[in-house]
Amino acid sequence: MSIEQLKSKLSEGAKDIKLNLSTILTEEGAPDLMKNQIGGIALASAYATRNPGIIDTILSEVSSYLTKPEINAAKSAATIMAMNNIYYRFIHLVSDKSFSTMPAKLRMNVIGNPGIDKLNFELNCLAVSVINGCGMCIDAHTQELTKAGASKLAIQSSVRIAAVLNATAIGIEIGGQ
């Protein structure tokens, strides 16, 4: 399925999402990001939406220019953040702060060795963390990105890609109801 076909699954009430979907996956629409960064962020975000149509569409769009390690890193970002975002959202929200002093005892080796450029992996992880709503992880990834030299515009572009793909998934889900 193409992006145009994906957009056709959205109702007229999702016109803004259709327009945003047309622009956010371009270098002009995602300032300070390179094409492979946009593709990785979009693919990690697609996996985070859990929508098979979006996953297939984005994978089809990016597979011509993302490397196998970049595709694998998008999968890794989505899966490791699925675990971390739940765990650290609990740590952040629970009123008993003694939990934050306990070791997580969760394996997270992929974060230290993602198989691609660390900054690109952090962009993917930030996007997934935004979709999953973990404030503690959002802060941590934003700090890592800033430390690594990512601009605020690049960080915002990553979040915008995540937001639009998440809205696309919801729009498709409720479109025919």
Predicted regions, residues:
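Hydrophobic alpha-helical segments
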Residues: 1-177
